[in-house]
Amino acid sequence: QQSDVYLGNPNLKKANTEIQFTEENVKEFLKCKDDPVYFARQYIKIVNVDEGLVPFEMWPFQEKLIKNFHKNRFNICMMPRQTGKSTTSVSYLLHYAIFNDNINIGILANKAATARDLLGRLQTAYENLPKWMQQGIVAWNKGSMDLDNGSKIMAASTSAAAVRGMTFNIIFLDEFAFVPNHIADDFFSSVYPTISSGKSTKIIIVSTPKGMNHFYRMWHDAEKGRNEYVPTEVHWSEVPGRDAKWKAQTIANTSEQQFKVEFECEFLGSVDTLIAPSKLKAMAYNDPVQTLSLIHI
Protein backbone atom coordinates (compact mmCIF):
# COMPACT_ATOMS: atom_id res chain seq x y z
CA GLN A 1 0.00 0.00 0.00
CA GLN A 2 1.28 3.47 -0.90
CA SER A 3 0.15 4.86 2.46
CA ASP A 4 2.42 2.42 4.29
CA VAL A 5 5.67 3.60 2.69
CA TYR A 6 8.01 6.21 4.13
CA LEU A 7 8.05 9.50 2.16
CA GLY A 8 7.33 7.78 -1.15
CA ASN A 9 10.22 5.29 -0.86
CA PRO A 10 8.68 1.89 -1.68
CA ASN A 11 11.61 0.10 0.01
CA LEU A 12 10.89 1.62 3.43
CA LYS A 13 8.07 1.00 5.85
CA LYS A 14 6.82 4.07 7.71
CA ALA A 15 6.43 4.10 11.49
CA ASN A 16 3.48 2.31 13.10
CA THR A 17 2.67 0.24 10.01
CA GLU A 18 1.03 -3.08 10.86
CA ILE A 19 2.54 -6.15 9.23
CA GLN A 20 0.95 -9.58 9.12
CA PHE A 21 3.59 -12.12 10.12
CA THR A 22 3.39 -15.67 8.81
CA GLU A 23 4.57 -18.50 11.04
CA GLU A 24 7.69 -18.76 8.84
CA ASN A 25 8.36 -15.01 9.26
CA VAL A 26 8.24 -15.34 13.05
CA LYS A 27 10.68 -18.29 12.98
CA GLU A 28 13.08 -16.39 10.72
CA PHE A 29 12.85 -13.22 12.81
CA LEU A 30 13.72 -15.12 15.99
CA LYS A 31 16.51 -17.05 14.27
CA CYS A 32 18.04 -13.81 12.95
CA LYS A 33 17.73 -12.17 16.37
CA ASP A 34 19.74 -14.98 17.96
CA ASP A 35 22.36 -15.26 15.22
CA PRO A 36 23.83 -12.10 13.62
CA VAL A 37 25.99 -14.23 11.27
CA TYR A 38 22.89 -16.00 9.90
CA PHE A 39 21.15 -12.62 9.53
CA ALA A 40 24.06 -11.14 7.57
CA ARG A 41 24.45 -14.20 5.37
CA GLN A 42 20.75 -14.51 4.54
CA TYR A 43 19.49 -10.92 4.40
CA ILE A 44 22.28 -8.35 3.94
CA LYS A 45 22.75 -6.97 0.44
CA ILE A 46 25.85 -4.97 -0.52
CA VAL A 47 26.90 -2.93 -3.55
CA ASN A 48 29.67 -4.70 -5.47
CA VAL A 49 31.92 -2.57 -7.70
CA ASP A 50 31.47 -4.90 -10.68
CA GLU A 51 28.09 -6.54 -10.13
CA GLY A 52 25.95 -3.92 -8.36
CA LEU A 53 23.63 -5.11 -5.57
CA VAL A 54 24.58 -8.62 -4.41
CA PRO A 55 24.07 -10.81 -1.30
CA PHE A 56 26.80 -10.50 1.34
CA GLU A 57 28.80 -13.71 0.96
CA MET A 58 31.00 -13.70 4.01
CA TRP A 59 34.53 -15.01 4.27
CA PRO A 60 35.48 -16.99 7.43
CA PHE A 61 37.33 -14.07 9.07
CA GLN A 62 34.26 -11.84 8.60
CA GLU A 63 32.10 -14.39 10.43
CA LYS A 64 34.67 -14.46 13.23
CA LEU A 65 34.54 -10.65 13.46
CA ILE A 66 30.75 -10.57 13.82
CA LYS A 67 30.88 -13.31 16.48
CA ASN A 68 33.49 -11.32 18.41
CA PHE A 69 31.41 -8.13 18.18
CA HIS A 70 28.39 -10.03 19.48
CA LYS A 71 30.18 -11.84 22.29
CA ASN A 72 32.48 -9.10 23.65
CA ARG A 73 31.89 -5.55 24.86
CA PHE A 74 35.21 -4.11 23.74
CA ASN A 75 36.73 -5.03 20.38
CA ILE A 76 39.81 -3.71 18.60
CA CYS A 77 40.49 -4.96 15.08
CA MET A 78 43.60 -4.44 13.00
CA MET A 79 42.79 -5.13 9.37
CA PRO A 80 44.38 -4.56 5.96
CA ARG A 81 42.77 -2.33 3.37
CA GLN A 82 39.97 -3.68 1.18
CA THR A 83 38.98 -6.59 3.41
CA GLY A 84 35.29 -5.71 3.70
CA LYS A 85 35.73 -4.43 7.25
CA SER A 86 33.16 -1.65 6.75
CA THR A 87 30.50 -3.99 5.30
CA THR A 88 31.06 -6.54 8.07
CA SER A 89 30.79 -3.91 10.80
CA VAL A 90 27.73 -2.26 9.24
CA SER A 91 25.87 -5.58 9.04
CA TYR A 92 26.39 -6.14 12.78
CA LEU A 93 25.30 -2.58 13.66
CA LEU A 94 22.15 -3.00 11.57
CA HIS A 95 21.38 -6.28 13.34
CA TYR A 96 21.81 -4.58 16.72
CA ALA A 97 19.50 -1.69 15.80
CA ILE A 98 16.69 -3.90 14.48
CA PHE A 99 16.67 -6.53 17.22
CA ASN A 100 17.20 -4.25 20.24
CA ASP A 101 14.81 -1.51 21.35
CA ASN A 102 15.71 2.03 22.42
CA ILE A 103 19.41 1.90 21.68
CA ASN A 104 21.75 4.55 20.27
CA ILE A 105 24.53 3.67 17.85
CA GLY A 106 27.31 6.08 16.89
CA ILE A 107 29.17 5.50 13.61
CA LEU A 108 32.29 7.64 13.87
CA ALA A 109 35.16 7.96 11.40
CA ASN A 110 38.22 10.15 10.94
CA LYS A 111 36.14 12.23 8.49
CA ALA A 112 32.42 13.02 8.70
CA ALA A 113 32.01 12.13 5.00
CA THR A 114 33.43 8.64 5.65
CA ALA A 115 31.02 8.12 8.56
CA ARG A 116 28.08 9.20 6.37
CA ASP A 117 29.23 6.79 3.66
CA LEU A 118 29.16 3.96 6.21
CA LEU A 119 25.66 4.97 7.28
CA GLY A 120 24.70 5.04 3.59
CA ARG A 121 25.83 1.42 3.23
CA LEU A 122 23.79 0.48 6.28
CA GLN A 123 20.75 2.27 4.82
CA THR A 124 21.16 0.44 1.49
CA ALA A 125 21.20 -2.88 3.35
CA TYR A 126 18.15 -1.77 5.35
CA GLU A 127 16.16 -0.84 2.22
CA ASN A 128 16.75 -4.34 0.87
CA LEU A 129 15.45 -6.17 3.93
CA PRO A 130 11.99 -7.76 3.66
CA LYS A 131 9.26 -5.46 5.05
CA TRP A 132 8.35 -7.92 7.82
CA MET A 133 11.92 -7.67 9.17
CA GLN A 134 12.16 -3.87 9.01
CA GLN A 135 11.26 -1.57 11.86
CA GLY A 136 9.19 1.41 10.74
CA ILE A 137 11.08 4.59 9.85
CA VAL A 138 10.61 7.69 12.01
CA ALA A 139 13.44 9.73 10.42
CA TRP A 140 15.82 8.96 7.54
CA ASN A 141 18.66 11.38 6.74
CA LYS A 142 22.21 11.36 5.38
CA GLY A 143 23.60 11.73 8.90
CA SER A 144 21.12 9.72 10.99
CA MET A 145 18.14 7.38 11.05
CA ASP A 146 15.47 6.71 13.70
CA LEU A 147 13.42 3.51 13.91
CA ASP A 148 10.04 3.09 15.56
CA ASN A 149 11.47 0.59 18.06
CA GLY A 150 13.23 3.63 19.55
CA SER A 151 16.66 2.82 18.12
CA LYS A 152 18.76 5.57 16.53
CA ILE A 153 21.91 5.53 14.43
CA MET A 154 24.00 8.64 13.82
CA ALA A 155 27.15 9.27 11.77
CA ALA A 156 29.76 11.93 12.56
CA SER A 157 33.49 12.57 12.68
CA THR A 158 35.39 11.20 15.67
CA SER A 159 35.50 14.14 18.05
CA ALA A 160 34.39 14.93 21.58
CA ALA A 161 32.05 17.65 20.25
CA ALA A 162 30.17 15.12 18.07
CA VAL A 163 29.16 12.96 21.04
CA ARG A 164 29.14 15.32 24.02
CA GLY A 165 25.90 15.11 25.98
CA MET A 166 24.76 11.95 24.18
CA THR A 167 24.50 8.41 25.48
CA PHE A 168 25.45 5.49 23.25
CA ASN A 169 24.96 1.74 23.50
CA ILE A 170 27.46 1.06 20.72
CA ILE A 171 30.22 3.28 19.42
CA PHE A 172 31.85 2.12 16.21
CA LEU A 173 35.18 3.82 15.43
CA ASP A 174 36.32 3.41 11.83
CA GLU A 175 39.98 4.03 10.84
CA PHE A 176 40.70 5.15 14.39
CA ALA A 177 44.47 5.22 13.78
CA PHE A 178 43.94 8.15 11.39
CA VAL A 179 42.35 10.35 14.08
CA PRO A 180 45.00 12.74 15.52
CA ASN A 181 46.25 11.74 18.99
CA HIS A 182 44.93 14.79 20.84
CA ILE A 183 41.44 14.40 19.32
CA ALA A 184 41.39 10.67 20.13
CA ASP A 185 42.37 11.33 23.76
CA ASP A 186 39.79 14.11 24.12
CA PHE A 187 37.15 11.87 22.55
CA PHE A 188 37.75 8.99 24.96
CA SER A 189 37.77 11.25 28.01
CA SER A 190 34.31 12.47 26.90
CA VAL A 191 32.70 9.21 25.84
CA TYR A 192 34.26 6.46 27.95
CA PRO A 193 32.45 7.32 31.24
CA THR A 194 29.02 6.87 29.60
CA ILE A 195 30.06 3.64 27.86
CA SER A 196 31.65 2.12 30.96
CA SER A 197 28.59 2.90 33.10
CA GLY A 198 26.49 0.35 31.18
CA LYS A 199 26.67 -3.44 31.44
CA SER A 200 26.08 -4.26 27.76
CA THR A 201 27.44 -1.13 26.03
CA LYS A 202 30.06 -1.76 23.37
CA ILE A 203 33.03 -0.07 21.70
CA ILE A 204 34.19 -1.44 18.36
CA ILE A 205 37.47 -0.07 16.96
CA VAL A 206 38.47 -1.05 13.42
CA SER A 207 41.51 0.36 11.63
CA THR A 208 44.59 -0.13 9.53
CA PRO A 209 47.68 1.12 11.40
CA LYS A 210 49.23 4.55 10.95
CA GLY A 211 52.50 4.83 12.80
CA MET A 212 53.07 4.40 16.53
CA ASN A 213 50.18 6.40 17.94
CA HIS A 214 47.17 5.88 20.24
CA PHE A 215 45.90 2.95 18.11
CA TYR A 216 49.31 1.27 18.38
CA ARG A 217 49.24 1.70 22.18
CA MET A 218 45.67 0.37 22.52
CA TRP A 219 46.39 -2.58 20.23
CA HIS A 220 49.64 -3.45 22.03
CA ASP A 221 47.90 -3.22 25.43
CA ALA A 222 45.06 -5.46 24.17
CA GLU A 223 47.56 -8.09 23.00
CA LYS A 224 49.28 -8.00 26.41
CA GLY A 225 45.94 -8.19 28.26
CA ARG A 226 46.44 -4.75 29.83
CA ASN A 227 43.02 -3.46 28.74
CA GLU A 228 39.59 -5.01 28.17
CA TYR A 229 39.71 -4.95 24.38
CA VAL A 230 39.60 -8.26 22.53
CA PRO A 231 42.15 -7.98 19.67
CA THR A 232 41.35 -9.44 16.24
CA GLU A 233 43.96 -9.36 13.50
CA VAL A 234 43.25 -10.23 9.87
CA HIS A 235 46.04 -11.15 7.45
CA TRP A 236 45.78 -10.09 3.81
CA SER A 237 46.09 -13.73 2.68
CA GLU A 238 42.76 -14.56 4.40
CA VAL A 239 40.98 -12.77 1.54
CA PRO A 240 40.31 -15.24 -1.30
CA GLY A 241 42.42 -14.52 -4.38
CA ARG A 242 45.24 -12.80 -2.52
CA ASP A 243 48.42 -14.82 -2.89
CA ALA A 244 52.16 -14.28 -3.49
CA LYS A 245 51.49 -13.22 -7.09
CA TRP A 246 48.90 -10.64 -5.93
CA LYS A 247 51.38 -9.35 -3.32
CA ALA A 248 54.16 -8.92 -5.91
CA GLN A 249 51.79 -7.13 -8.28
CA THR A 250 50.51 -4.80 -5.54
CA ILE A 251 54.06 -3.90 -4.44
CA ALA A 252 55.01 -3.26 -8.08
CA ASN A 253 52.05 -0.87 -8.42
CA THR A 254 52.68 0.92 -5.09
CA SER A 255 55.74 0.36 -2.89
CA GLU A 256 57.01 -2.14 -0.35
CA GLN A 257 56.68 0.42 2.45
CA GLN A 258 53.04 1.09 1.52
CA PHE A 259 52.28 -2.64 1.33
CA LYS A 260 53.79 -3.21 4.79
CA VAL A 261 51.56 -0.56 6.34
CA GLU A 262 48.31 -1.04 4.40
CA PHE A 263 48.31 -4.83 3.97
CA GLU A 264 50.88 -6.32 6.37
CA CYS A 265 49.49 -3.96 9.05
CA GLU A 266 52.92 -2.96 10.34
CA PHE A 267 53.17 0.00 12.70
CA LEU A 268 55.82 1.81 10.69
CA GLY A 269 56.30 5.55 11.06
CA SER A 270 54.24 7.55 8.60
CA VAL A 271 57.16 9.92 7.96
CA ASP A 272 60.91 9.43 7.70
CA THR A 273 62.45 9.46 11.17
CA LEU A 274 66.03 9.74 12.39
CA ILE A 275 65.80 6.18 13.74
CA ALA A 276 64.51 3.67 11.17
CA PRO A 277 60.88 2.61 11.84
CA SER A 278 61.93 -1.06 11.71
CA LYS A 279 64.33 -0.40 14.63
CA LEU A 280 61.67 1.47 16.60
CA LYS A 281 59.26 -1.41 16.06
CA ALA A 282 61.80 -3.90 17.42
CA MET A 283 61.98 -1.96 20.69
CA ALA A 284 59.52 -3.29 23.24
CA TYR A 285 56.69 -1.00 24.34
CA ASN A 286 56.51 -1.85 28.03
CA ASP A 287 55.44 -0.13 31.21
CA PRO A 288 58.37 1.37 33.17
CA VAL A 289 59.63 -0.62 36.16
CA GLN A 290 59.20 2.44 38.37
CA THR A 291 57.55 5.80 37.82
CA LEU A 292 58.89 8.75 39.81
CA SER A 293 56.82 11.87 40.34
CA LEU A 294 57.17 15.20 42.12
CA ILE A 295 60.91 15.45 41.54
CA HIS A 296 62.10 19.03 41.96
CA ILE A 297 65.45 20.03 40.53
Predicted regions and their residues:
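Pre-P-loop entry segment of helicase/translocase ATPase cores
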Residues: 1-74
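ASCE P-loop NTPase helicase motor core
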Residues: 128, 134, 178-254
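ATPase catalytic-site recognition across NTP-hydrolyzing enzymes
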Residues: 186, 238-294
